[in-house]
Amino acid sequence: MPINEIRVQKGQRYRDAINDKKVIAVKKGDKFLDLDEIAGEDEAVQPVYLDSEDGLYILRHSAAHLLANAVTNLFPEALPNTGPVVENGFYYDFDMKPITEEDLSKIEEEMKRIVKENVPIRRMIYSKDELLKIFSKNPYKIRIINENVEGKSSVYQQGNFVDLCLGPHVPSTGYIKAFKLLSIASAVYKYDESKNLVRIYGTAFPDEKSLRRYLENLEEAKKRDHRKIIAEMDLAVFNSEWAPGFPMYTPNGQIIRKELIKYMDYVNGKNGWTDVWTPHVFKDTIWKQSGHYAKYKPNMYLFVLPDGDSYGIKPMNCPGHIAIFARRKYSYRDLPVKYSEPGTVYRYEKSGEVGGLTRPRAFTQDDGHEFIRMDQIVGEIKTLLGMVRETFTTVFGNIEMAFDLSVIDKEHPENYLLSYVCKDCGNRVEGLRGTDIECPVCHSHNMDPDFSTWDNATEQLRQAMDSMGITYKEYPGEAAFYGPKIDVHVKDALGRMWQLSTIQVDFFMPINFGLTYTNSEGKEERVVIIHRAIYGSYERFMAILLEHFAGKLPTWLTPIQTYVIPVGTANAEYARKVNKSLLDAGIRSVVDDGPDTVSKKIKMIHDQRPSYIVVVGAKEEQDNTVTVRNRAGKSKTYGMNEFLEIIKNEIEKRSVGQAF
């Protein structure tokens, strides 16, 4: 028996078998159970501790119920809808009148009162008819019951509050000691967009220390919000009247964008990628053939020209790259063919979902598509993962990365493009998706999905990561409908995980477009496409960079690399000479030779976050030197040529830290 398992006898309550107040539930196989449940047989279960990942989820789930309990105590007319656990916390939606920050404080105090009472939380099972009676005054719960309950289901009760829920929960409200309500928002009811619900966000942790650390990080995150930094550094314009959701880059912002593109061009070039360009608009026939029309139509910008032809602004770059690849025939020796493009795509998002650079309606991807043989998958995936590691290490420095492998859910083949084999006539059909597949030869519906292509590609992705010593998690059912994929996340300076890179295998777009090559035996064989984006998108990547570095970007990315200040007007000419030397050396430099004091000039330029402030006075002019101040406030005097070499070296190496 594993060391973390506990033996429980038939008829024994889990709580009695464990008798450890740090344990809040048990896990039996893949199922979580309340401590008050009784073992149906002699069995081994795993204890779920409050401070574990699973324990934190259960704690926050219980905190959401605690929130609903407090709200309905204070606002009896409020109708609870749903209250899920989300990243870093939870929320609950209510049909009620809008509330204020003052109300939020009162709700939190009521939650604390219920916690202090240490109310037991009990699980009870009812039939569907009984559930409909219990929640007869709440149309939101009635809908959930009618859509999800067939025979019986569970509710959880704490004092006078009862909620529909599968559980599990902490044993009593006294376990929810460290929590905080964070904000109020408006949420649209998914079944009726005219109905606005009140959404209350909160978080909970196993202890006050963890909660305090999280709240401190939240405050720091507000200071690092990329939208705030963008305004301070004058990087982009967001105009809700003329271009809602379409960011426009200022000269400063375009510098960062161009440097990122330049670096990706370098990484692409040394790994065999060639640059292409594709238009922003295509006839809708290409989107229908690619499958994007069916999947993305609600998010596409579509229009009809006077001649009657229908067009769509591209939501993806891949069909354009496919059109370029399809211009000629290929031998097996020609593959892989790798196309890359900083391609801008356009996707409609509801106005309430658009925000800053992380959720725009137009964004530029460092998009790449390679056309390969099936036997090349492992090698090419390893190359791509190497590009990911090199890129993130260069840009962020020593940063934690996490890798996810999204695979097919074989229990639901209808969600994926698959090959099917007719059990009656043996005919094989490629690239079908749906629930009622018909054989085009004998018209039988007795069709078996063939997972072999998916299995082969998925195993090659595993092999690639295993051979590189990469630890990864697998997520069944998270694959795209046309193939398995790898997602790469990074952890920023505040400990937040951000999904950036995607490496996606695609077997079925080659079927849609008839993409083949001639193999070594002279026969036509289908190519495989790998879609990849290392940054993800330049917009999102820039937002994460700004927040990670709090706007103090590495010098090679910083719009103003040096800011030259004369001590007085007598040294203004020397300051201009120093600035020209920097500009001539390719350094992005600005001189402020105005009449303000040095301290005032430094204060004025603070929000622009230059890499170095160069101060020159009479002594520097006499000695042909410069006094350089770094971002930490440390100053050092260099000869002019010496400083030029130092900063040029820092930029050329794309160093994350400063030279001193």
UniProtKB/Swiss-Prot annotation:
Cofactor binding description: Binds 1 zinc ion per subunit.
Keyword DNA-binding: no
Cited SMART domains: tRNA_SAD
EC number(s) stated in the UniProt entry for this protein: 6.1.1.3
Subunit-level organization: Homodimer.
UniProt KW Cytoplasm keyword: yes
Function: Catalyzes the attachment of threonine to tRNA(Thr) in a two-step reaction: L-threonine is first activated by ATP to form Thr-AMP and then transferred to the acceptor end of tRNA(Thr).
Domain TGS positions: 1-49
Name listed for the protein in its UniProt record: Threonine--tRNA ligase
Gene field: thrS
Recorded GO CC terms: cytoplasm
